[in-house]
Every structure is written in C-alpha cells, then in structure tokens.
Amino acid sequence: MIIAIDGPAASGKGTLARNLAKHFGLNYLDTGLIYRAVGAIVLEKGKDPSDPLSATKAAQSLTNNDLDRDDLRSEASAAAASKVAAIPGVRAALLAFQQHFAASPPGAVLDGRDIGTVVCPKADIKFYLLASAEIRARRRVKELQDRGEEAIYASVLSDLRARDERDSGRSTAPLKPASDAFCLDTDSLNAEAVFKIAVETIEERFAPNKRSGS
C-alpha cells in the first residue's frame, strides 16, 4: 500500500505520515528532507539555492547519508529547500529516488508537496492537509521553541507565506491537491484527531465490510 500525503509547510503532514506508517507497518519518507538536504548542501558550498546549476548538481550527487545532517531542520535549510524545489532539474533528479522508495516492500507513506500529483499519482490513497498560514505559523513557532530555538511569530509567518507562494506558483509540480485526494482542514483539529480521521478513511477504503464482521 502506498499512502501519499501533501500540503503546505507546517500543515501536519509529517506527524500524520509518521503515525500512519507506524500504525500500518509501512516505510516512511519525509520527502521534504530530500529538498532540505539539497538546499543545505548548496548553502554549505556558499552558493545561491535559486541557482539552477548549483542546485541541480547538488541534487544529482545526493546520498542517503545527506539525509542524516544535523542542520536539516533549521529554518535556513527549510527556506533553501523551497527555492531549490522550484528548479525543474532538481525535481527531476530526485523523482526516481522517491519512486523507488515508494515501490519497495511492504509499502510506504510519503509526505511532501507533489506526492499525489507527480511522485505517486497511482498511490492507493491520497490526503491533502489544509491549514491557514496563521495557524501553521503558530505551530512552527512552538515546534522551534520546543527544540530550544528562537522563533519570532511575524518572521515565521512571513516566511511561510513566501514559501506558499513559491510552492504553489512554480511551473514544475506546483503545490495543489490531487483530484482524488481526501482534503482535511486541520485548523481546528489536533494531530490525534487528524490521525483518527485518516485511519478511518483508509480502513473504509480497503476494508468496507470490516465493521460488519464480514
């Protein structure tokens, strides 16, 4: 089974994906980490993440070890990720990696921006998480503060809005829900509630007679 989860930054994709992978015994890939790794590599070399040549070269040389970098959760890597993700050459270089992961047994949960539309268009089930920029900014601030990092709400909100614009406005694989995705507005839902809805949706899709005992 392949589960695709898409949505804007800080919408709760990662939390839901990790919980579903654990619940159903599937592999999990945070595809955002791949783009963060590329962005971090470009920054480390002193290059501009918006430069197609530098970013594509970094994507083509990416290894699994790069996904273990300590700086991937930084805001600098996150901002760089959004910039490199808008470059067609980067997306092409990373597409095969993601598709190979998804096809590996026993199945996988992938979260990102274009999983249901580009990476795994034939995924068994797709979710698209929605949340206002203000709610997402508050969540991100709490996440950063919980990690002991300084975070200013206005700055985080501005960054999220800029990333939303880049993600939805890029010409290659723009952020948008797949036509067959289940859309979940998480503004008023906590992680547990979102997980419960997703599990029920999956079980109803694949085991319609489960509740009746058939």
List each language-model region with its residue ranges.
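Hydrophobic anchor at the beta1->P-loop junction of P-loop NTPases
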Residues: 5
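P-loop (Walker A) phosphate-binding loop of NTP-binding proteins
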Residues: 8
